[in-house]
């Protein structure tokens, strides 16, 4: 890719700008441009689409997304040290890369982007889950994004695609599979990163559904699921006791045995319970 976009290899970029990954920001830099190109291809055809990228760092994935033909990339970066490297990419792709210095949790990205919108990111580990839940629980169908292509620790990725009854099954699996079709697209070893994390990483691809698999209010479903799995080893009548008065009556109304545990409930059952609670 260095030959394609005329930009130097990422190791040279990092050396030139004296960049080092900050543990406090959850940073791990992915330097192999062949890998970032593979990740950039996961969403599919990006021509005519805008892409939101969170935590671009020195810009490896950014370069991949632009090379894949993204109409525009909005890169939100909290670390000011990375901005000169990103501006260097912006100069190579005039009018197609906009960089915002800030916290992705506080920036309304939709104000800067036009549909269709994809999200792709090597997410900072310390905010990745919070951002994902936010993207999975807007009130609107379909959501503002078409696909999410996100890198996480492999353990988190496995939680997103987990099935009922497994140890990994929980809030992320239910919200992700309610909102989207989710799959692990590829797995990356620790040595692909600088510094090398202690665990493998994985890229998760989520394709937004145009309507929910089962009707439910996003906020209510999120609250029910979070409460149920906060004490996942307890029976539902105990784990959900503080959620709303008369929880056993609500469970009975939708045919769920109150002695079951959260990890045994299907997505359909959680949605039925959320509808029942919302109806009062």
From Swiss-Prot:
Gene3D superfamilies (UniProt xref): Ribosomal RNA adenine dimethylase-like, domain 2 (1.10.8.100), Vaccinia Virus protein VP39 (3.40.50.150)
Intrachain disulfide bonds: none
EC number: 2.1.1.182
Primary location recorded for the protein, binned into one broad class: cytoplasm
Pfam families in UniProt: RrnaAD (PF00398)
GO molecular function: 16S rRNA (adenine(1518)-N(6)/adenine(1519)-N(6))-dimethyltransferase activity; RNA binding
Enzyme class: transferase
Superkingdom, taxonomy of origin: Bacteria
Residues bound to S-adenosyl-L-methionine: 28, 30, 55, 77, 103, 122
GO annotation, cellular component aspect: cytosol
InterPro entries the record matches: KsgA/Erm, rRNA_Ade_diMease-like_C, rRNA_Ade_Mease_Trfase_CS, rRNA_Ade_methylase_Trfase_N, rRNA_adenine_dimethylase, SAM-dependent_MTases_sf
Key words of the record: Cytoplasm, Methyltransferase, RNA-binding, rRNA processing, S-adenosyl-L-methionine, Transferase
Compartments where found: Cytoplasm
Reaction(s) this enzyme catalyzes, per UniProt: adenosine(1518)/adenosine(1519) in 16S rRNA + 4 S-adenosyl-L-methionine = N(6)-dimethyladenosine(1518)/N(6)-dimethyladenosine(1519) in 16S rRNA + 4 S-adenosyl-L-homocysteine + 4 H(+)
Family: Belongs to the class I-like SAM-binding methyltransferase superfamily. rRNA adenine N(6)-methyltransferase family. RsmA subfamily.
Function: Specifically dimethylates two adjacent adenosines (A1518 and A1519) in the loop of a conserved hairpin near the 3'-end of 16S rRNA in the 30S particle. May play a critical role in biogenesis of 30S subunits.
Protein name: Ribosomal RNA small subunit methyltransferase A
